Design a protein with these regions (language model features):
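Short acidic/polar active-site loop segments enriched in Thr and Asp
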Residues: 90
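Short beta-strand and adjacent tight-turn residues that come in two discontinuous sequence segments
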Residues: 94
Length: 95
């Protein structure tokens, strides 16, 4: 059976400090509960490193909000799946 996931898409919300506080609050709550689902947090790109650092120490994963259909090239502002993988991102919202 496939693992069920709860995925939080933050859209374009939170400052860096607010993102840090929220991720820490979520990590604390996840330690209190024995969930039978995986949890993935998808903050804005600027906060992915913060999310991956906290995810490594806690019971959730970090995910991206989008990725490019291209592997590389002159696509300003795009981020490839390979780039995301290099920083430890295993999940991405597509669509």
């Amino acid at each position: 059976m496939k693992e069920k996931l709860v995925i939080g898409n933050w859209k374009m919300n939170k400052s860096f400090g607010e993102a840090d506080d929220l991720l820490n609050d979520i990590a604390d709550k996840l330690q209190e509960y024995q969930l039978r689902t995986g949890v993935v947090m998808c903050p804005p790109y600027l906060y992915l490193e913060l999310a991956t650092d906290l995810a490594d120490e806690n019971d959730f994963s970090a995910g991206a909000q989008n990725c490019s259909e291209f592997d590389n090239g002159a696509y300003t502002g795009e981020i490839s799946a390979e780039m995301l993988s290099e920083i430890g991102i295993e999940f991405c919202i597509v669509g």
